[in-house]
């Protein structure tokens, strides 16, 4: 009985550890709202909004540029002019911007995700 328990526990531990290693998501650089707010006036950074045009037109971080997540990769040539800058990518909650950050990194940009997106943003907002 003890042998069965030891074997069962060992198998469970191996399966558990394997699933943790296998499902470990790729990490991306992330900024908090507070950190992002400090960078807003830094000319070495640009903020890119990957929400829909309607969301961006309603409210957005001042001086941010808009490229919807759906069009981001196909418009990468338009973003090339920002290659020398660090890019802060944001959306409503941080999900779309996480995808956008990965796309930009894939193309060689220095990009980071604004954690929590507009839901967590405490800085200034332009309302149109």
Regions found by a protein language model. Name each.
Residues 2-34, 39, 45, 53-86, ...:
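Rhodanese-like catalytic fold shared by cysteine-dependent sulfurtransferases
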Residues 89-91:
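Metallo-beta-lactamase
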Residues 49:
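Phosphate-rich cofactor/ligand-interacting catalytic cores and adjacent structured alpha/beta frameworks
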């Amino acid at each position: 009985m003890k042998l069965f328990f030891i074997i069962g526990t060992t198998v469970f531990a191996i399966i558990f550890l394997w699933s943790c290693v296998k499902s470990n998501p790729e990490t991306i650089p992330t900024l908090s709202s507070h950190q992002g707010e400090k960078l807003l006036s830094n000319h070495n950074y640009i903020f890119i909004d990957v929400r829909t045009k309607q969301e961006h037109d309603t409210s957005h971080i001042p001086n941010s540029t808009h490229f919807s997540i759906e069009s981001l990769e196909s418009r990468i040539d338009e973003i090339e002019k920002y290659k020398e800058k660090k890019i802060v990518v944001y959306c409503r909650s941080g999900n779309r911007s996480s995808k956008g950050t990965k796309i930009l990194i894939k193309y060689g940009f220095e990009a980071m995700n604004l954690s929590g997106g507009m839901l967590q943003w405490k800085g200034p907002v332009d309302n149109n």
